[in-house]
Amino acid sequence: MTKREKKKPWWKKLIIILAVILVIYLIFHFAFAYFSNVICENLSSIAESEQYIKKGNEKIKLGAYFEDIDSILNQSLELSKLAYEPESKDESRKEELEKLGYENVMQYNNKPSQLYKHLAKKNKNASIMMSAVNATVATKQLDGGETLIVVAFKGTDSSNINDDLSDMYKAVDDNGFHKGFMFNAKQFDKKADKIEFTIDNKKVTLSQILEEMKKDDCKYKMLVTGHSLGAAVADIYSGYILKNEGINDNNIVTVTYGTPKSCAKDFTYSGNNIINIINTDDMVPTIGAENHLGTCLYFTPSESFRKTNYKEHYVTPNAYNSYSDLIKTVESSLVAHNLVFSYTPLVSELEKEHSKYFIED
């Protein structure tokens, strides 16, 4: 520094430093506010997601019976799990649900015929959908004289995973819905006049109930749920009957788990009664269409949660994060789909190369 150069007064330096700090603060403040509103919250547990629905999210306002979030989450979890039971266990599923207070327990199954399957395989480029639609339906009497109608769509069946995941390739339709999931949802909706319940000693069809659910003072409430593939069908079915059949959104709520993307990127849904609970470790929600329908509540499991629940599939953070980072780089559903099928051999290779990261049995 030459003698002619003068040092800036200390107070000017202080002002500059404070100005920089203020700018940084404002950037982070507004960025945080923006992403908090636009991007789904990253929750640490389902328990926290319950509190989030109760206290923190103004977008989610569920009416009447649906304000009991604890009950809704517990019921949807139990129903999603029981929907997985094979047909051979229909009777035990019915008994289990009856113990929980449900009535009119039925299993809806729309299996494609052998001819239909043959045509689908012969015409791989045609728009032929061949996945079966499986759903458990039941009713439950609520305090106050209302009747809850539950529809639990079955998720991906490991014995039929190739057919089920083939739905992930289907493009969106003109309305912005995923074609494969929409096909399954419509197949179920078409049978609404065939699904019959006995309520208050009277026969009533699901179609008649849906007609009543257009009213504000309806005595029927509906809970729709599902996991994985069943979650996407549940979302689409709910969105479809809300939009196309004019169901009052105070009469229905949908809670799903591990939900694939089911609509176009630019598809907008102003309702707030479709809630998707997603484990950030799960790869299934990264595939499907381009966007999720409804509100997503993300939670990131703790290591103790992973170790307890993943069991033999558990790997410590270093090994898991390597694969997780790879998943985050996918640019299309096709790539994500291929990565899902590469998961098992990849983990096997990771275990060979990084055995210290894996928990031995």
Predicted regions: what they are:
Residues 79, 151, 282:
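A residue-level signal for conserved active-site and pocket-lining positions in enzyme catalytic cores
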Residues 230-231:
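Catalytic nucleophile loop
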Residues 1-6, 10-11, 102, 119, ...:
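Generic N-terminal leader/processing signal
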Residues 27-34, 65, 83, 101, ...:
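Intrinsic disorder/low-structure terminal segments
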Residues 88, 104-225, 242-253, 268-271, ...:
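A conserved cap/lid and substrate-binding interface adjacent to the catalytic center
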Residues 82, 140, 154, 279-280:
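Structured loops at beta-to-helix junctions and adjacent beta-edge loops in soluble globular domains
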Residues 28-130:
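N-terminal low-complexity, Ser/Thr- and acidic-residue-enriched intrinsically disordered segments
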Residues 3-18, 25-62, 146-148, 193, ...:
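Serine hydrolase/lipase
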